[in-house]
């Protein structure tokens, strides 16, 4: 066993009883401490077994728990509003000291999996430190509730963003080290990277992934175009069309079919994602029929 996914932890302390913990603290005193002790105990066991070569992914946390593992957002609904809440939670978690965070792509419960929502969530999940697909109740992106249950187009989108997320691993690791050493998170709301610009506080769907990649996540259904703010002081390369370079300090609108998330690269950076349109075309060529 190389790691654990630690579910629950935040609702296991009965507040209405007179119970006490082993050290004498009441359950009410333990309500926030319990999630920290939960992941800490698991961390210490795993460390004794594996040294530093293991991983813990927890759902519950409180001040101090981020030193022991990475986190995901728990049971999010499979609705557009669920994706919206994940976009907000990613950035809030980052500035609260949880730099390694992800969400259940597609949501976890309550309602049919929607193809467009799943496609948007895959795109967003690519630009999170943790990318995982999380539907339950025998549902998955390879077994949809509605016909066709096996959707080659959706799986091609998954392939596109899984490939891109893997390409980003060295970049992510670089700023994971920075987060560990300095506290500066991997994911940075625009106002954190560009504090002097008012529009950086207003555009909450747009954030920085590290200092050089700007992402503007989409949660609404039916959006065929999207407008986002590009901070002034830099020039920005459209990752979907590297020939399009924009001066910062303006809002831009680009076409956004369901598979496409606005991504811009700071021009003077060393980031090399390639042409995302070409990567998308390659993912389409690999579409397959449902296996026997």
Each model region followed by its residue ranges:
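Catalytic-domain carbohydrate-binding cleft regions of carbohydrate-active enzymes
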Residues: 1-292
